[in-house]
Design a protein with these regions (language model features):
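Catalytic or ion-coupling anion/metal-binding cores of large enzyme and transporter domains
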Residues: 1-172
């Protein structure tokens, strides 16, 4: 209930600041979201939700966007169920902001995007610190040099299928 109350307060704060959904949900913000997801190890659900959000704001997003972003985004976290660490560990290590700071430091995020805080991504992550490099690996020591998802195409999935590459064992 506490989280719901805080979410409601945040919505009202955005309303009072005249920050509208289309100010936040831009093409750049959606690509940032996919990049961060790749670094976190990903959820295949991202490839359902991000295109739907993009459609609502008039951005033609398709699953083929995943591979180029994955190829340049290091996988920095190995979270359960695919890995040994949990969301609580990520939070204690500096949270998503610390992951975003790692990515921004190598130019993988658009830091000018407006966020729900009323500040830009860059302003939000400016003071983020990675407190545990075993939970959030630095970009020069990732779990993998590529992001957590891959889109595969072939005779079984001519339009593409999504695999959570970060959960696949190396032998495969």
């Amino acid at each position: 209930i506490k989280l719901a109350k805080h979410a409601g307060m945040a919505v009202m704060d955005m309303y009072n600041k005249n920050i509208r959904p289309r100010d936040i949900m831009t093409k750049e913000a959606i690509l940032n979201a996919l990049t961060v997801d790749m670094a976190l190890g990903c959820s295949t659900n991202s490839m359902l939700h991000l295109p739907a959000i993009a459609h609502e704001v008039g951005f033609d997003f398709d699953i083929s966007f995943a591979n180029p972003i994955s190829e340049k985004t290091p996988n920095l976290c190995h979270l359960a169920p695919a890995g040994p660490t949990y969301m609580e560990d990520l939070n204690e290590a500096g949270g998503v902001y610390a992951v975003m700071k790692e990515l921004a430091d190598i130019g993988l995020l658009n830091t000018d995007c407006m966020t729900v805080t009323g500040k830009t991504v860059g302003e939000n992550i400016k003071n983020a610190v990675n407190k545990n490099p075993e939970v959030i690996r630095p970009v020069d020591n990732p779990y993998s040099k590529t992001g957590g998802l891959a889109v595969l195409k072939g005779n079984l999935a001519p339009d593409g299928g999504v695999v959570k590459r970060s959960a696949v064992v190396d032998e495969m």
